[in-house]
């Protein structure tokens, strides 16, 4: 009972110390409000309102159909220019795409020739250029084929494709961006808050006070883990309900309570990583440098940004030892696909095992650090 009381009292002390740290409070608020909203809306993964210009040298019915096929929300209204204005517009960054339809284009198409339509792409706008190139090719090909056939799909295919989008029928970026921002920020804040809590003790000289108190390194470490973990757990829950479901109107398919249980297991592992990094760093700038080395690989290689199957096999095997890989897997299964505990229990069990390993390593390192200070 005495040990539990010490853990509780030390945890309350950590919460009071956090309330006095205005920078950390601002980071918490930003991470689960502005960051979530911007990740969902500012940088869409699909093509959105791309500026496009067309130099129509043919002035035919077919060229008009092609021009009218570029419409919102994928493209802005095409700007009609001359061929001489094309290079200047691309150089000035006014257009991402500039299409040059040659003279006699319709006549050559109907005659069975193969006229060339020049599509110039500003590749400095990487996301739009990569996605829009395929869009434009499909649009032009579709309009030419339908013009030749006089109407679309006049031939009956032997096989009819029935395409249904599961879990995100309208392919909305908000569904993916908002949830992944919360997942990434949970990991980031768990490491930052626990690591900074330990460094704050060292910088303020209160670590020496703890050394003369009847508390063990285990109790000190557990207090930091439960207090900082509780903060991340509460604010992530509020962000999921108020920001994602409320402001962004993103539907959550599964149980939020089950997801929060997964968050708690993930926090057990990531807060232990934060404690370990706090013992290595001697100041907040050093902790920030360590964060770059640790956090970026955890976020980029966990399967949230890029499917794990697209990574080299060695990277996949290494990342299986990291908690973020399993956390992303269970979070996507619960929040996107409505998975129940019977489906995600392997990830829960793996997170618990990985958390126990990281906790043990961090505790041994923390005891060694405390012993050197004594």
Name the predicted role of every residue range:
Residues 2, 199, 276, 335, ...:
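Junction motif at the cytosolic side of a transmembrane helix
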Residues 192-213, 225, 370:
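Transmembrane helix boundary and interhelical loop/hinge segments in multi-pass membrane proteins
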Residues 1-11, 76, 314-325, 374:
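Short, membrane-interfacial amphipathic segments enriched in basic
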Residues 84, 167-171, 251, 302-358:
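Membrane-interfacial helix-loop-helix junctions in multi-pass membrane proteins
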Residues 1-175, 343, 368:
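Extracytoplasmic/periplasmic domains immediately adjacent to an N-terminal transmembrane anchor
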Residues 174, 178-195:
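Long, hydrophobic alpha-helical segments
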Residues 33-36, 217-291, 296-299, 342-348, ...:
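Alpha-helical transmembrane segments and their short interhelical loops
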Residues 37-47, 281-321:
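Transmembrane helix segments
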């Amino acid at each position: 009972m005495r040990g539990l009381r010490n853990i509780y009292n030390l945890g309350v002390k950590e919460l009071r110390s956090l309330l006095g740290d205005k920078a950390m409070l601002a980071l918490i608020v930003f991470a689960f409000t502005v960051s979530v909203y911007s990740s969902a809306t500012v940088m869409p993964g699909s093509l959105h309102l791309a500026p496009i210009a067309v130099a129509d040298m043919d002035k035919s019915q077919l060229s008009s159909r092609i021009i009218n096929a570029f419409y919102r929300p994928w493209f802005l209204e095409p700007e009609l220019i001359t061929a001489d204005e094309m290079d200047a517009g691309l150089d000035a960054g006014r257009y991402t795409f500039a299409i040059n339809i040659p003279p006699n284009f319709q006549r050559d198409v109907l005659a069975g020739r193969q006229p060339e339509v020049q599509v110039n792409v500003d590749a400095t706008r990487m996301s739009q250029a990569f996605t829009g190139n395929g869009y434009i090719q499909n649009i032009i090909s579709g309009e030419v084929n339908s013009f030749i056939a006089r109407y679309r799909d006049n031939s009956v295919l032997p096989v009819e494709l029935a395409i249904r989008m599961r879990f995100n029928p309208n392919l909305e970026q908000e569904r993916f961006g908002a949830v992944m921002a919360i997942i990434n920020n949970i990991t980031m804040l768990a490491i930052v808050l626990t690591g900074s809590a330990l460094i704050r003790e060292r910088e303020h000289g209160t670590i020496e006070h703890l050394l003369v108190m009847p508390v063990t390194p285990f109790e000190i470490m557990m207090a930091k883990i439960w207090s900082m973990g509780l903060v991340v757990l509460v604010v992530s829950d509020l962000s999921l309900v108020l920001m994602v479901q409320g402001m962004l109107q993103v539907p959550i398919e599964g149980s939020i309570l089950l997801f929060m249980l997964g968050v708690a297991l993930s926090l057990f592992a990531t807060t232990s990583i934060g404690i370990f990094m706090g013992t290595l760093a001697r100041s907040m700038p050093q902790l920030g440098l360590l964060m770059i080395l640790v956090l970026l690989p955890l976020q980029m290689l966990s399967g949230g940004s890029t499917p794990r199957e697209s990574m080299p096999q060695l990277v996949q095997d290494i990342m299986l030892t990291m908690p973020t890989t399993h956390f992303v897997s269970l979070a996507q299964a619960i929040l996107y696909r409505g998975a129940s505990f019977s489906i995600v229990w392997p990830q829960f069990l793996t997170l618990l095992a990985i958390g126990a390993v990281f906790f043990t390593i961090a505790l041994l390192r923390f005891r060694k650090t405390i012993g050197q200070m004594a």
